[in-house]
Amino acid sequence: MSTAQYPARARVAAWAVHILTMSGLVWASLAMLATIHPRREFTWMWVWLLVALVVDGVDGTLARRARVSEIIPWFDGGIVDIVVDYLTWTFIPAVFMYVALPMGPRPLAGLLMALVLSSSMFCYANKQWKSTDYYFVGFPAAWNIVALMFYVLQTPGVFNIIVTLIFVVLTLVPTHYAHPARVKRFRALNIGAVVVWFLATCWLVAIYPQRPLSLVAVIVVSGGWFLLAGVLRSLRGAESEAQPSGTRS
């Protein structure tokens, strides 16, 4: 069935999803401009990256519902998604870590940025980076989350360096990390934890540099749950073989 044979409403819906995904390029551009702004507009940078995070969290589901790959087969939204993801999940956060966070002397900070950017390719270029039960296999280059936690929790340089190196290595190790919406096991708990984490994080960004202990505890517990869910899946072993996957959605 050719594209023209689908109802106009279906074609409009499919293109609307593609436009939503492409809007990530706008949010990425605004975030990058805020990062390099002379006044160091880091709050706005995180606002735009959080907007991009929300878009990335829903566009995959909408794409499947709108059957975009079937209705517009010649336009690969998965490639658009990968470009946007690399910018918003990896590149801009890595630059932010170099520019704004205590990451050691400048040469070391630059080396760490290079390690983050290059090691992430083993995630984005990995055709088997997601298991058949929808866990990410290897750290999924979620440097926006790592950098955001460093920022709002105001962690010291030594901690930042050690954690960065650990996650660089974990990108290459077949440990598991839960997709909050697509993993069936603990799905309700996963989604609830994401919502709680997101709201608490937005609050901390808004009131930065304040960091009430109650909000810190909420973030640590909700974020820690995802790490625990991944550990539990890793301990179960290779029950499901990895599957080809082009996007993180």
Residue ranges and their predicted role:
Residues M1-Q5, F136-S249:
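C-terminal membrane-associated helical module and adjoining short loops/tails
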Residues S23-A34, V55-T61, L87-W89, D133-A141, ...:
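Hydrophobic alpha-helical transmembrane segments
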Residues L30-W48, V83, L87, F91-L112, ...:
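Helix-coil boundary and interhelical linker segments in multi-pass alpha-helical membrane proteins
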Residues L49-D56, L115-C123, F167-P174, S222-A229:
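Alpha-helical transmembrane segments of multi-pass membrane proteins
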